[in-house]
């Protein structure tokens, strides 16, 4: 089951938080979901080259707060924050509500699955060989501190007449382990031969029940001392 299901959805409430954080009435829920989808699609389309890793939408009774996590926040902010105000006005006009926009920097873009998938897609659109693009992203992720990474590409690879799927795996990616912090990303590359889909899974380590990474837990727990062996009498 872990091989088939989306690893983010499988771990919601365990070691992953929701990207839409609000509690509406039943009647307003469909409209809120549609608004969230509009906001995310607009941000992804207009700010694609800023490297959008995540878009979190939080709601109160009257306000909507959008937090954009980007690898290159300077592109979004602009000179003296002028572009942020434009984005804020555009989103407010799109949704018809007052919107507050926060910009956060993705400090480790190498181990963001979404950014890695988009990186492969951009390379394929520049006609880089798909195996080289996959290997390059995998090397960067492992250098950035990932414990394991799996990259899958599917479509008319290399311009072949028949579509196929190829994937590479480095390190460990335990999809069935719920305490494992696994990030997942998907992107599409629009090439002259058609559309190629890219999926990326990145394993960032395991988390215990208290939210402590297993590496730190092993350091803090002291090893039990061995008792000295008893001397046998002659």
Curated annotation (Swiss-Prot):
Assembly information from the UniProt record: Part of the 30S ribosomal subunit. Forms a tight complex with proteins S10 and S14.
Source organism: Aliarcobacter butzleri (strain RM4018) (Arcobacter butzleri)
Keyword RNA-binding tagged: yes
UniProt GO BP: translation
Gene3D superfamilies in the cross-refs: 3.30.300.20, Ribosomal protein S3, C-terminal domain
Function: Binds the lower part of the 30S subunit head. Binds mRNA in the 70S ribosome, positioning it for translation.
Matching CDD domains: KH-II_30S_S3 (cd02412)
Entry protein name: Small ribosomal subunit protein uS3
Keyword rRNA processing: no
Residue span, KH type-2 domain: 39-107
Compositional bias ranges of the Basic and acidic residues kind: 213-222
Taxon lineage: Bacteria, Pseudomonadati, Campylobacterota, Epsilonproteobacteria, Campylobacterales
InterPro entries on file: KH_dom, KH_dom-like_a/b, KH_dom_type_2, KH_sf_prok-type, Ribosomal_S3_C_sf, Ribosomal_uS3_bac-typ, Ribosomal_uS3_C, Ribosomal_uS3_CS
Keyword line: Ribonucleoprotein, Ribosomal protein, RNA-binding, rRNA-binding
GO MF assignments: mRNA binding; rRNA binding; structural constituent of ribosome
Gene Ontology annotations for the cellular component aspect, listed alphabetically: cytosolic small ribosomal subunit
Compositionally biased spans, kind Basic residues: 223-234
